[in-house]
Amino acid sequence: MNAHEALAEIAGKMFGDNAKKVMMVLASNVEVSDEDLAKDLKMDPPELRKLLNDLFEARLVKYRRARDENIGWYKYYWRITDEPIQQILSDRKRLTLSILEKVLSLEENSETYVCPKCGTRYTVDEAENNNYTCEVCGEVLEPFDNTHRVEKLKRAIELLGNWDPSPKQQASRAIPHA
């Protein structure tokens, strides 16, 4: 799998099939305007622009803006990023670990309540403010045992913490050890 195919796979996992299709079109071109992309992929232009912006925020694509002298508007030309995939993945790993660790801390250090009927969760303060009744359906709230969630978060942090996005590490995983 080459770098562009890998980026397309990543985009597909993050944003869905349309993102993968966009990345594949961009991989076969130097630059493509969002208008041409929309035509090629038969996508609604505003939907495509939102997807391109999501891909840009994820650092998977870049753009160049040029003024159309005839109408005075800007045209945007998109291309696949030139950043190393490993750097993008390492940064995303770091960000994801940070978020997971914050969520774990909240889960371990706070008491929550849940509605047995509709499943809405409440912090202890929210539960107290509502007299331990659900705002949605009026049921009496029950303490929520988040032990399972805490264990899942710890496992996810462990797995992600041990994951190395470098090509050398990925190649060694593909080869069975004797």
Curated annotation (Swiss-Prot):
It comes from the Archaea. Residues 3-86 form the HTH TFE/IIEalpha-type domain. GO terms for molecular function: DNA binding. It holds the Pfam family Zn_Ribbon_TF. Keywords: DNA-binding, Transcription, Transcription regulation. One of its GO terms (biological process) is transcription initiation at RNA polymerase II promoter. Belongs to the TFE family. PANTHER family: GENERAL TRANSCRIPTION FACTOR IIE SUBUNIT 1, TRANSCRIPTION INITIATION FACTOR IIE, ALPHA SUBUNIT. The winged helix domain is involved in binding to DNA in the preinitiation complex. Monomer. Interaction with RNA polymerase subunits RpoF and RpoE is necessary for Tfe stimulatory transcription activity. Able to interact with Tbp and RNA polymerase in the absence of DNA promoter. Interacts both with the preinitiation and elongation complexes. Transcription factor that plays a role in the activation of archaeal genes transcribed by RNA polymerase. Facilitates transcription initiation by enhancing TATA-box recognition by TATA-box-binding protein (Tbp), and transcription factor B (Tfb) and RNA polymerase recruitment. Not absolutely required for transcription in vitro, but particularly important in cases where Tbp or Tfb function is not optimal. It dynamically alters the nucleic acid-binding properties of RNA polymerases by stabilizing the initiation complex and destabilizing elongation complexes. This is Transcription factor E. The lineage of its organism: Archaea, Thermoproteota, Thermoprotei, Thermofilales, Thermofilaceae.
